[in-house]
Amino acid sequence: MVVLCALRTARTGISRQIFSTQPAQFLHCSGARLIVADKDLLIKLRKKTGYSFTNCKKALEKFHSDLQQAEAWLHEQAHKEGWSKASKLQGRKTKEGLIGLLHDGNLAVLVEVNCETDFVARNIKFQQLVQQAAVATMEHCHSKQANTIDYTKSFLMAEEIKQLKTSLDNRALADQLALAIGNLGENMAIRRAAWVAVPSDWYIGTYVHGQLPADNPSLSKMMFGKYGALVVYRALEQNSKINLPELGRRLGQHIVGMMPLSVGSMDDPPGDDSETKMLAQPFLLDSGTTVGQFLQMSGVSVLDFVRYECGEAAEVGETV
């Protein structure tokens, strides 16, 4: 409780002092009589940007109640403050965070974004950053898939993801990351992303464990949690009794829980709980049956999967 209160106090102090490191002209006005900001405009600007009333008032006064210019200036100052804060916090460990999952038809994306504390991971501004990373990766996937109908799987590491542009304001994700760091006062990292695209007669199963509720309607298409899985599969035969989307969710649940390293072969002998080939593993939801046997009874074939665990050890060649 003491730690939680300290974190809340720290975040409150940061929000009150936003832009405090900016040049004097940002928070200091000339001795001439200031133009009184229209109350409705002030409330509107505050609601739209989330910045303090003090800074919204200064922006409106600076631009003579021009809402558009005031908003643009506030964002510019916030990005400068964010980069300054990011530079100061660089090197602090980011072991917490979220896995974000976005699924749209025959495309699906997993991203991992890290922060210092679980408290910040539950903040909507952090979740919006995860969403921006997922959407930017999805748009990148769309551009790569424009002229192909084949199955594709691809991975993006930190530096590649940060260069992607967001649809929000066409800024690079690196800028959005710096802005979030400035707003929330913790070091953060956009670590990695994976995406899969499948032909029209294939399926993508999705599952997130430790899922957080979407507290904002704008996040309704996202899934957030500490573990996430994508599984690619197809039906070998028509069976109206099989709920294929639900089957995909169960396979994703198995992948998260049993941590397979490869799909394996239907010819692999049944293994125990230490087995790493998915088809030979005991099925998580029915330990008396292997995954391979379950799929055979369902008339389904698994082709590939991706599993992410937030904060897991970096793979060879990966930088965090």
Question: Which residues does each PLM region occupy?
Answer:
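N-terminal assembly/interaction segments in proteins that build large macromolecular machines
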Residues: V2-R11, S15-V320
